[in-house]
């Protein structure tokens, strides 16, 4: 036993005893048979042996912790201590609100799980019996309590992550910078022929990834990267993050506000407990603990769930909440840290432009499969965004007017500022009359007053635009004199820079002014750029209907071959002749397509092109899919064939494996159209954005195949773009879960083919992960900084491994084998659809009031093809299978290893150590496997399957369990880990922390789903209801368990 004193780390006198970790020795690969495991319990038990359930760990600080984490770290002890405090507060609140009886029920439920935090083996009746006999009210309270527990744990972990980042940032800032000749520790020279590598890939850091600016730039200097290359990359750096709504994000604003207040109180408590003279501040600490208790009690008495189906505008409000609360203030700090770190290492280099990192949004503009998103809704969204950002600017300028109180008695003023004041006195005579005397010697205050008038007028016009759309679009808007409002953020920026220039010329600077200029550069007057998205067949159907009405084709458009469609579309794109009559005698679907494009044109005229200039075509398959949108854009004036200019960027979204494979051919055909690359007059060199979808390709072919096809598509698209001298920006449609491309963004970006990044990237930020990334300022900064540093690294230090053809051939074989095995289960196993519908909560999820978007596409079918990727992944996650994120990987690896056991194992281990792409894939699979619990998954099968289906469903489950066992074994073998997640102790701790509580919550979900389905069967067959509970009560209980498991897993769909 190893004893560590807590007193050394600022905690009460106590000792933690650390047991040596129990390790599993993987059998040598080559026999073809993995060791026998009970659903990989050896691996899971080994991981759990390192970390006992949170209950035992937190009861007393003197209890032994079976962990090999670095408990010599004060920060780790700090986390343990804080978790203890929060769990104690949780129990206190439940005891106060519900009595000791509920606390006893929760304790009993958690105690009935295995010591490793796993579900007990099916057949152990104790836990099931307790759950089944619970009254519905007790079951709902238990579900709420567990959900609250997870939310509190998430807050503590976010707080811990933020503290980690702050400490790491301060440490890196204070450490002396190494000289250019000093060799960094942990660098290893890889002997690979130089022609296979990028110029600086010979030196690869094996530890301390430079995920912050303070670490990155010294590392680049150590590697002798030419400053000119860094400057060129910095000048073109273009990072875009696009917020999306999410069907599984069901946490209310009200709850988010409470979470933020609790995080603030925890930060105050930290300052008191870790500062000096703690004994004298104990009373203050007790007061904060009392406030925490009150906040948690208020939270307990608040509805976690929406009482109505959220509208699209509700989702807009939710997404923009993060800009209001965090991002608007955080983004200038990102620029400041970049500038200071760059110039601290390379003092002669210039920082990037302020808006190197920008934001977009699909919320309120993504109409793919969501009939609730109309042209009117998108217009309202744009007006709302504009209103929010104008409010922030008005507040900032009012503050600046107080700060810039410089008097002409004591400070010089340049003639150009005085000249602008004279002109504005004529534009705003009333303001001049009111303020000229008051500010006669304070020109900056007078200038800022005129700026405020313009901002107020701009906001007033925006409000009237929004009201006009809501009430009567024909109502005329009030007229404003030229120059009395801002048409765009550029004019506002010119006024601010005039003040900045005057201050600079007189030897002054103002941080608040610099910050506001940075914010205006980034957010403009639109806050975020709106992307329109629509499914490709909607455009084909619209053009088909238009052509049928006009009788201009010898046969229906949809019956033409691809070559015939393309030829006709190209011909139509050469003329201004309109196709669409003003009155539009078409179906609602076709009218909506045209009205959307007309609304985009109106938005651009009113708010500028940047407000909305991207049109994404989902399920893009052929060249005609892109030309159809361009033709419809021509009809509303977004493209002019005579000038050859377009204000709309047409973006293909390739989603399925087949479409990813065809993407290079489609883009080649597009770039070879003479008129196409000349569409955007603002670009010195044409820029094309291409979006790659992770969700549908994963659902189509499995995790390994999807990731490899996307990787290949990026390389091929990069080659096509370079051959045609077109700049390429890849738009990664990543979800929150691994099964939809989720996972750490830093590792994912480093795993991209380096030459395809080239300083440009666009990534979706899914609604379900927004809170984990942007709820706290330092977390938001860290997320943005890691993305930025990863883009710089990937662009400058590409590994070159992606170009080693024999490795690519091996990955091609692994992907094909994985795809075959995955599709054999998902699409060829005849019982899988029934299995999925019965043993996961998919039907209940589809009916829940948690999103404005339907769970299925409108095909009239209820097969897997019509099911969207999000509920597909969500359902597997809730039932603890997490199947889309790992199934098929084990078989692919095993078949490869059986060919040459020892040699191929060594090769895969080398891949894992050196190849960022392969390491990323295996790491994501390992993380997912650690979250799987097939014991409780089997409970879903046992309890929710119809009796007549039990036998065939058991066969399906056995097939899944065998693949899980195999995948666990081979991942551990390749990584040389004794337990899952040995390479990431913090994630390992986080997963284990939750396991003991997710298990009873899963059992509660099964019991509630069982009652809900029995209720439905009774009413459908007899028309009578024999349950004591209403359908609404049962559905509410089920939703609470979904909410709790989602919080516990920290990602869902």
Swiss-Prot record:
One of its GO terms (cellular component) is cytosol. Its cofactor is Mg(2+). It comes from the Bacteria. GO terms for biological process: carbon fixation; oxaloacetate metabolic process; tricarboxylic acid cycle. One of its GO terms (molecular function) is phosphoenolpyruvate carboxylase activity. The gene is ppc. This is Phosphoenolpyruvate carboxylase. SUPFAM superfamilies: Phosphoenolpyruvate/pyruvate domain. Belongs to the PEPCase type 1 family. The active site is at residues 246, 699. It is an enzyme of class 4 (lyase). Residues 461-473 have a biased composition (Basic and acidic residues). Forms oxaloacetate, a four-carbon dicarboxylic acid source for the tricarboxylic acid cycle. Its EC number is 4.1.1.31. Keywords: Carbon dioxide fixation, Lyase, Magnesium. The keyword S-adenosyl-L-methionine does not apply.
């Amino acid at each position: 036993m190893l004893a560590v004193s807590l007193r050394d780390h600022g905690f009460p006198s106590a000792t933690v005893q650390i047991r040596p970790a129990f390790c599993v020795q993987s059998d040598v690969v080559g026999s073809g048979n993995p060791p026998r495991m009970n659903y990989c319990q050896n691996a899971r038990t080994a991981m759990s042996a390192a970390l006992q359930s949170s209950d035992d760990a937190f009861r007393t600080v003197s209890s032994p912790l079976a962990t090999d984490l670095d408990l010599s770290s004060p920060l780790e002890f700090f986390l343990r201590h804080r978790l203890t405090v929060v769990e104690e507060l949780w129990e206190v609140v439940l005891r106060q609100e519900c009595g000791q009886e509920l606390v006893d029920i929760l304790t009993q439920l958690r105690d009935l799980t295995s010591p490793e935090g796993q579900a007990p083996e099916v057949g152990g009746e104790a836990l099931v019996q307790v759950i089944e006999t619970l009254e519905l009210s007790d079951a709902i309270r238990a579900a709420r309590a567990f959900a609250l527990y997870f939310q509190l744990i998430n807050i503590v972990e976010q707080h811990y992550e933020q503290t980690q980042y702050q400490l790491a940032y301060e440490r890196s800032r204070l450490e002396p910078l190494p000289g250019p000749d000093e060799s960094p520790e942990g660098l290893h020279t890889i002997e690979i022929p130089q022609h296979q590598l990028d110029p600086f890939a010979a030196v690869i850091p094996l530890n301390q990834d430079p995920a912050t600016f303070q670490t990155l730039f010294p590392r680049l200097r150590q590697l002798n990267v030419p400053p000119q290359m860094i400057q060129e990359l910095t000048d073109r750096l273009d990072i875009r993050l696009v917020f999306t709504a999410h069907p599984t994000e069901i946490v209310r604003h009200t709850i988010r506000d409470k979470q933020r207040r609790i995080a603030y109180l925890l930060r105050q408590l930290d300052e008191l407990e870790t500062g000096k003279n703690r004994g004298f501040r104990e009373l203050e600490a007790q007061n904060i603990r009392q406030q925490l208790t009150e906040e948690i009690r208020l939270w307990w008495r608040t509805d976690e769930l929406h009482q109505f189906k959220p509208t699209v505008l509700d989702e807009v409000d939710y997404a923009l909440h993060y800009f209001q609360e965090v991002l608007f203030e955080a983004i200038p700090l990102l620029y400041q840290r970049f500038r200071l770190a760059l110039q601290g290492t390379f003092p002669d280099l210039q920082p990037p432009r302020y808006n190197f990192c920008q934001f977009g949004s699909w919320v309120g503009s993504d109409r793919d499969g969501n009939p609730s998103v109309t042209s009117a809704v998108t217009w309202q969204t744009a007006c709302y965004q504009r209103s929010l950002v104008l409010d922030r600017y008005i507040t900032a300028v009012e503050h600046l007017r107080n700060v810039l109180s410089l008097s002409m008695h004591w400070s010089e003023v340049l003639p150009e500022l005085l000249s602008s004041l004279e002109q504005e006195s004529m534009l705003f005579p009333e303001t001049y009359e009111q303020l000229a005397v008051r500010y006669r010697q304070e020109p900056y205050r007078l200038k800022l007053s005129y700026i405020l008038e313009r901002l107020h007028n701009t906001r007033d016009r925006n409000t009237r635009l929004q009201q006009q759309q809501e009430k009567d679009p024909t109502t005329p808007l009030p007229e404003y004199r030229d120059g009395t409002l801002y048409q765009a953020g550029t004019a506002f920026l010119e006024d601010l820079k005039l003040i900045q220039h005057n201050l600079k010329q007189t030897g002054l600077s103002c941080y608040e002014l610099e910050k506001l200029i940075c914010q205006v550069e980034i957010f403009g007057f639109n806050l975020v750029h709106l992307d329109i998205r629509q499914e490709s067949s909607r455009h084909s159907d619209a053009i088909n209907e238009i052509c049928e009405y006009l009788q201009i084709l010898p046969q229906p458009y949809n019956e033409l071959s691809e070559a015939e469609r393309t030829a006709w579309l190209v011909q139509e794109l050469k003329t201004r002749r309109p196709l669409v009559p003003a009155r539009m005698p078409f179906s609602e679907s076709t009218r909506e397509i045209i009205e959307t494009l007309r609304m985009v044109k109106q938005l651009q005229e009113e708010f500028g092109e940047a407000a909305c200039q991207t049109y994404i075509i989902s399920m893009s398959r052929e060249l005609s899919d892109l030309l159809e949108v361009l033709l419809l854009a021509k009809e509303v004036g977004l493209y002019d064939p005579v000038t050859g200019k377009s204000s709309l960027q047409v973006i293909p979204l390739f989603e399925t494996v087949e479409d990813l494979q065809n993407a290079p051919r489609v883009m080649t055909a597009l770039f070879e159209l003479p008129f196409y690359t000349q569409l955007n007059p603002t670009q010195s060199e044409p820029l094309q954005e291409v979006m790659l979808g992770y969700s549908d390709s994963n659902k189509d072919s499995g995790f390994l195949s999807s990731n490899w096809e996307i990787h290949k598509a990026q390389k091929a698209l990069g080659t096509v773009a370079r051959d045609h001298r077109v700049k390429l920006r890849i738009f990664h449609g990543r979800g929150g879960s691994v099964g939809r491309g989720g996972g750490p963004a830093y590792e994912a970006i480093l795993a991209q083919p380096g030459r395809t990044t080239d300083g440009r990237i666009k990534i979706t930020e899914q609604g379900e992960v927004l809170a984990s990334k942007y709820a706290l300022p330092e977390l938001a900064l860290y997320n943005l900084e890691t993305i930025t540093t990863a883009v710089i690294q990937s662009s400058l230090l590409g590994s070159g491994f992606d170009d080693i053809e024999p490795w690519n051939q091996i990955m091609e074989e692994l992907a094909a084998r994985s795809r075959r095995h995955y599709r054999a289960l998902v699409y060829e196993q005849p019982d899988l659809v029934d299995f999925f519908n019965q043993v996961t909560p998919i039907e209940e999820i589809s009916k829940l009031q948690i999103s404005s978007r339907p769970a299925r596409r409108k095909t009239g079918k209820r097969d897997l093809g019509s099911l969207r990727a999000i509920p597909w992944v969500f359902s597997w996650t809730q039932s603890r299978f997490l199947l889309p994120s790992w199934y098929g990987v084990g078989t692919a690896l095993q078949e490869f290893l059986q060919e040459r056991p020892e040699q191929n194992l060594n090769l895969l281990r080398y891949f894992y150590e050196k190849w960022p792409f392969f390491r990323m894939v295996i790491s994501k699979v390992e993380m997912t496997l650690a979250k799987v619990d097939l014991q409780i998954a089997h409970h879903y099968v046992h309890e929710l399957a119809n009796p007549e289906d039990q036998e065939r469903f058991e066969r399906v489950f056995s097939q899944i369990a065998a693949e899980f066992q195999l995948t666990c074994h081979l991942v551990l073998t390749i990584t040389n880990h004794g337990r899952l997640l040995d390479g990431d102790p913090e994630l390992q701790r986080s997963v284990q922390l939750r396991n003991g509580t997710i298990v009873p919550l899963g059992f509660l979900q099964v019991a509630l789903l069982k009652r809900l389905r029995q209720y439905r069967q009774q009413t459908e067959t007899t028309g009578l209801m024999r349950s004591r509970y209403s359908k609404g009560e049962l559905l509410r209980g089920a939703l609470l368990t979904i909410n709790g498991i989602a919080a516990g897993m920290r990602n869902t769909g």
